[in-house]
């Protein structure tokens, strides 16, 4: 465990046999927005939820089953299956400028741990870092493997889907859209639950303290992520990158930034 905990999000997932899996998200969160936009200033924020009272005063929005506890945030409700949750920064962030066409760059660094409650607990679906419309809202049909990101397009009732760009940390293979050959991966998602680019991870990788960095390079129009396993240390990092123009893919000028997670009713 880290001695200094800056931000901690927690979610719990369960299988049909009622064996819970606890996913402790975000020990450390830092977001820096570099703005090259007219009438815009750079933005940065971080939170240390281990300090009493910081969580209560944090400018964060909680959606659906996410909830603030004393020193952490639970993204999903472990007591029931098919739970979803989102937590987003309370203010809009400026992605691009209509008059000039310029797009902002940013970086987000965070550390998290995924810890099974028992040694034989099955893996849940995972979590994601997302960008979407502001004010943020909760998808109505994005449970299980949809990671509370994008509505299930196999449901005819879901005619439209909110524009969303994300980096997913996927801990469970869904045969309908996840890549073959691996049960765990990181991916870049652009308006679709099927990742535009993925990097496979070893089975059982999401077990221990991990550090992640998500970076958008506006000049290169590239969204990339790096994931390291900190405990135990010494393993090489895993990276994923995709070409994404945040303006051209439909994200608004004023966007929401946050994290999402969902669980299903797992059957082994």
List each language-model region with its residue ranges:
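Polar, low-complexity loop segments and adjacent catalytic/binding residues used for recognizing
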Residues: 2-268
């Amino acid at each position: 465990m880290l001695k200094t905990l800056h931000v901690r999000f927690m979610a719990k997932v369960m299988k049909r046999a009622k064996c819970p899996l606890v996913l402790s998200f975000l020990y450390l969160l830092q977001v820096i927005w570099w703005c090259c936009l007219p009438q815009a200033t750079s933005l940065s924020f971080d939170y240390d939820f281990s300090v009493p009272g910081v969580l209560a005063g944090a400018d964060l929005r909680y959606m659906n089953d996410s909830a603030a506890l004393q020193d952490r945030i639970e993204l999903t409700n472990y007591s029931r299956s098919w739970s979803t949750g989102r937590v987003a920064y309370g203010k809009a962030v400026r992605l691009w400028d209509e008059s000039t066409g310029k797009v902002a760059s940013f970086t987000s660094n965070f550390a998290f741990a995924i810890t099974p409650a028992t040694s034989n607990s099955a893996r849940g679906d995972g979590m994601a870092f997302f960008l979407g419309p502001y004010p943020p809202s909760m998808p109505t049909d994005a449970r299980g493997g949809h990671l509370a990101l994008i509505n299930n397009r196999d449901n005819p009732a879901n005619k439209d889907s909110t524009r969303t760009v994300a980096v997913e940390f996927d801990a469970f293979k869904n045969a309908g859209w996840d890549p073959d050959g691996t049960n765990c991966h990181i991916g870049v998602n652009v308006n679709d639950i099927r990742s535009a680019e993925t990097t496979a991870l070893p089975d059982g990788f999401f077990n221990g303290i991990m550090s992640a960095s998500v970076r958008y390079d506006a000049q290169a129009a590239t969204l990339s992520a790096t994931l390291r396993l900190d405990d135990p240390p010494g393993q090489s990092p895993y990276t994923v990158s995709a070409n994404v123009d945040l303006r051209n893919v439909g994200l608004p000028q004023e966007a929401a930034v946050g994290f999402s997670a969902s669980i299903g009713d797992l059957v082994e």
